[in-house]
Amino acid sequence: RRQRQMCIRDSIKDSFMSVVDYAESKVTAVHYSLLNAGLFINVKDNVFIEEPLQYIVISDKEQCLFNHVTIQVGKNSKFNFIENYVNNQKEDKAPFSLVSEVVAHEGAQINYSSITNQPGEKRGTILRRGLTYRDSLINWNVAAMDEADVYHDNTTNILGDGSEANLKIVTLGVKEQKTYFNSEVVNQGLS
């Protein structure tokens, strides 16, 4: 049992903050220092999970949310993930910061879907970062249904030959909402 705990701890240690560094910016430094929720998923090599894992975060009182999702998908594995952020407090003015790190190892495929719904008084950032190794794929599907002012940064680093990333974004603007999107796919060369 102790050996298993050490294995899990080492896996988290190797994955957490491997794509988004705390020293990257003031936004990430604040995110890591105020982190109050999150999820870690490690899919082993050669595992196919057809049924999507759905992660729902519901805010039913005024609060700051600094949530972090870390997903590692092993070699030749396939995984589907859906995250849903819902805030039922229309007068909630507390800031939020959501960070997702996704790593697709050789031959892995990840379908990552995200639905956010934050009320109009909130302000926040959503950073989604991915790494793809040889012959791997990350499909990002983002539905930004927020009334809040949100900065979205979606960056995927293509590290391996034959790997790819796709991004689809749907958003609805309402009232005086300001939504900013920065999307990058960075090809780092053959490996």
What positions do the PLM features span?
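Conserved beta-strand/loop scaffold segments within soluble protein domains that form the structured core
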Residues: 11-191
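Short, small-residue-biased leader/transition segments that mark boundaries at the very start
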Residues: 3-8
